[in-house]
């Protein structure tokens, strides 16, 4: 399943998201969800300890001026890879 986090992690149910994770799931951070990928932040530690791959959308990172602040443990992708993820995971959950 592809999980997409589009809201600020401060306004999202991160614990609920973590409970819903399954084998092979991936988390794509989009819109304000990219705030969860800030290196040294509270949420990046939580996500790095989760048993999933975490990915962030480059355009949303750039739009928020966060390019130099994103954890190196996060894969940063463009819209083409976003589409590939959506095809790879026909089941999706938005947070």
From Swiss-Prot:
Pfam families attached to this UniProt entry: DsrH
GO biological process, one term: tRNA wobble position uridine thiolation
Function: Part of a sulfur-relay system required for 2-thiolation of 5-methylaminomethyl-2-thiouridine (mnm(5)s(2)U) at tRNA wobble positions.
Localization per Swiss-Prot or TrEMBL: Cytoplasm
SUBUNIT field: Heterohexamer, formed by a dimer of trimers. The hexameric TusBCD complex contains 2 copies each of TusB, TusC and TusD. The TusBCD complex interacts with TusE.
Organism: Enterobacter sp. (strain 638)
Family to which this protein belongs: Belongs to the DsrH/TusB family.
Protein name in UniProt: Protein TusB
Classification via InterPro entries: DsrEFH-like, Sulphur_relay_TusB, Sulphur_relay_TusB/DsrH
Coiled coil stretches, renumbered: none
Keywords: Cytoplasm, tRNA processing
UniProt key word DNA-binding: no
A GO cellular-component term linked to this record: sulfurtransferase complex
NCBIfam families linked to this entry: PRK13510.1, sulf_tusB_dsrH
Domain of life assignment: Bacteria
